[in-house]
Curated annotation (Swiss-Prot):
Pfam families: CP2, GRHL1_C
Record-annotated disulphide pairs: none
Gene name for this UniProt entry: grh-1
Localization (cell): Nucleus
Protein name per UniProt: Grainyhead-like protein 1 homolog
Keyword presence, Transcription: yes
Region feature (Disordered): 377-405
Segments forming a coiled coil: none
Keywords: DNA-binding, Nucleus, Transcription, Transcription regulation
Source species, domain of life: Eukaryota
Family membership noted in the UniProt record: Belongs to the grh/CP2 family. Grainyhead subfamily.
Natural source organism: Caenorhabditis elegans
Disruption phenotype: RNAi-mediated or conditional knockdown result in defective cuticle formation. RNAi-mediated knockdown in L4 stage larvae has no effect, but upon reaching adulthood, over 95% of the embryos produced by these animals arrest and fail to hatch. Development arrests at the three-fold stage, showing abnormal constrictions or puckering in the external cuticle and approximately 8% of embryos exhibit ruptures in their cuticles resulting in the extrusion of cells. RNAi-mediated knockdown significantly shortens lifespan.
GO biological process: defense response to bacterium; determination of adult lifespan; ecdysis, collagen and cuticulin-based cuticle; molting cycle, collagen and cuticulin-based cuticle; regulation of transcription by RNA polymerase II
PROSITE patterns: GRH_CP2_DB (PS51968)
């Protein structure tokens, strides 16, 4: 049925019954100047589209990648448009046939397929080499682990699940690729799995909120000592050539930093410390055993010792980490960065590459934060189990996280690292660096590659600690001098001994030689930090107060020269 539009009334009128109009006949709705449609050029070629059959994005197991090597980058759920040859300026492009290329999937039929999400979000798969394959796809929420990484865009390596057909049996094979996001570390560390050879264990409980596909996370407290045990089980496939081995235990960054970046980060951390001799890694020698000789400090973040692998008791060394994971966060409120307790063991004395390298991922908290973190995770785990039990009791329900997280364990086993060539970053503080006291042969890198150490100079601090007591007392009291000046000392004395800081007439120091000097800012900053004194506070009749600090001579006269 045709229709006619009356322009005066804008009312559509239908044609009388029985009237036939051909499709090529002009219609009255057109203006009078374009009524003759027969003289116009046909534009069907500009709008006609070939029927499209867009290929579905499919991802196949790696064993079938070689079957389709010639396939280039495949973009799923995209739109293609046809352009006529008259609109193309490049003649070579005009010969290109525009059609949706249907993927030939005959090589994959009834063989195996990759189960992926049914979400309508686009997936982009780039088929390149085995080591360069990157897949960008939506992913479920990662484990609630505080990795400290900022909210960057996720670059994801999905966990592939490959299923064989019914003829091949039901087999599930999970690849070694990790699921990554902004909430856990983007670093995938190649590992070796071997129950023989060197085995290291950190005596601290692991987190139960980390997925099995991610490395175990161990929470420790700053300054608290934990035991690390080293043992060796003979491996016939990789035998030792020496009876005594050298091990270097260190604290390093988990992030994939270069050697220079890691050293600069440690330098920045050390510059913020109040004590110039502050170490990153502390050792309790009294509670350590199994070493041959003494434990050597080869860096602020590393120690070295020798031991006999054939000794069945192995080595037990007590360590404490003196830095926080939040010390390396660039923004306030960002979760702390994870660190590694790394052990490099050398078979030969002069070997540059370690025979074995193991690591344990840790996160360092303050004020018993590790225990609080573990308690919170235990509560979440119990709540998760209740939800799983409820979901499993419903018809068709299943426990989604069965075996998904690491089980609770009071000991954290070290992973065996595959890469051994990367040199360990041993940080030596500028104030402690003396070339004549450092044996370059004991280091695993060339000393000439280290940047020149700045000239040694006195380190000024914003805080000074003094230990004082009255004559009739036996216990010393700490005086926190903030700021590190005479006014700060007067304020500390007034607050500690009940005087008015505005009426302090003077502060004096009586040296061990018997002379009395008036304390000034330079003397306080350069010569009095962590010294011990007997204090005399005298109150005058006019309300003023004077304090005299009497230096206590050390019991060992050589203790000052050795410090």
């Amino acid at each position: 049925m045709s229709f006619q539009l009356d322009q005066s009334t804008s009312v559509i009128k239908t044609a009388p019954p029985g009237r036939l109009e051909f499709k090529n006949e002009p219609i009255d709705i057109a203006s009078s100047n374009i009524q003759d449609l027969a003289k116009m050029q046909t534009l069907d070629g500009y709008y006609q589209q070939t029927s499209l059959q867009l290929p579905q994005s499919q991802q196949y197991h790696r064993m079938y990648e070689n079957v389709y090597n010639n396939q280039q980058i495949l973009y799923a759920q995209t739109q293609n448009f046809q352009y006529p040859s008259t609109l193309l300026t490049n003649g070579s492009l005009a010969q290109t046939e525009w059609r949706g290329q249907q993927m030939d999937t005959s090589a994959y039929s009834n063989t195996g397929y990759s189960r992926s999400s049914t979400s309508q979000q686009p997936q982009y798969t780039q088929q390149v080499t085995e080591n360069e394959r990157i897949v960008y796809k939506p992913v479920d929420m990662p484990s609630p682990v505080d990795s400290g990484i900022g909210g960057d865009i996720s670059i994801l390596n999905p966990k592939e699940e490959f299923f064989t057909s019914a003829d091949g049996g039901s087999m599930l094979e999970r690849s070694s690729e990790r699921t990554l996001s902004h909430r856990d570390s983007p670093l995938v560390i190649p590992k070796l799995y071997n129950n023989l050879g060197f085995q290291y264990v950190l005596e601290a409980p692991i987190s139960t909120s980390v997925r099995r596909d991610d490395d175990r996370m161990t929470y420790v407290n700053k300054g608290q000592f934990y035991t690390v045990s080293l043992e060796y089980t003979p491996d016939l496939n990789k035998c030792l050539k020496s009876q005594t081995v050298k091990s270097q235990l260190m604290v390093v960054f988990r992030e994939d930093k270069t050697y220079e970046e890691e050293i600069k980060t440690w330098q920045s951390w050390h510059a913020r410390q109040h004590v110039s001799k502050q170490r990153i890694l502390e050792i309790d020698s009294k509670n350590s055993s199994g070493m041959i000789g003494q434990i050597e400090e080869i860096g602020n973040n590393a120690v070295q010792f020798y031991w006999n692998p054939s000794d069945p008791s192995g080595v037990r060394i007590s360590i404490a980490v003196q830095c926080l994971s939040t010390d390396f966060s660039t923004q306030k409120g960002v979760k702390g960065l994870p660190l590694h307790v790394q052990i490099d063991t050398y078979d030969g004395e002069n070997d540059k590459v370690p025979f074995h390298r193991g690591y344990c991922q840790i996160k360092v908290f303050c004020d018993k934060g590790a225990e609080r973190k573990l308690r919170d995770e235990d509560k979440r785990a119990q709540k998760r189990k209740v939800q799983e039990y409820t979901a499993g009791a419903l018809p068709g329900g299943r426990k989604k996280s069965d075996g998904e997280y690491h089980d609770q364990c009071e000991r954290s086993e070290f992973y065996h690292m595959r890469e051994l060539d990367k040199p360990a970053a041993l940080f030596i503080a500028p104030e402690e660096f003396e070339p004549r006291y450092v044996d370059s042969t004991s280091l695993s890198f060339d000393m000439s590659e280290i940047e020149p150490i700045p000239t040694k100079r006195p380190r000024t601090s914003e805080r000074i600690m003094l230990y004082v007591r009255k004559r009739d007392e036996q216990i010393y009291q700490p005086l926190h001098v903030v700021p590190a000046s005479l006014s700060g000392l007067a304020l500390a004395i007034a607050n500690k001994f009940g005087a008015d800081p505005d009426k302090m007439s003077g502060v004096y120091k009586r040296c061990a030689k018997g002379i009395t000097v008036k304390v000034d800012d330079e003397m306080l900053r350069l010569y009095c930090n962590e010294d011990t004194f007997i204090i005399d506070v005298e109150h005058a009749t006019d309300g003023s107060t004077a304090a005299t600090l009497i230096e206590v001579a050390p019991t060992n006269p050589n203790s000052y020269s050795n410090s």
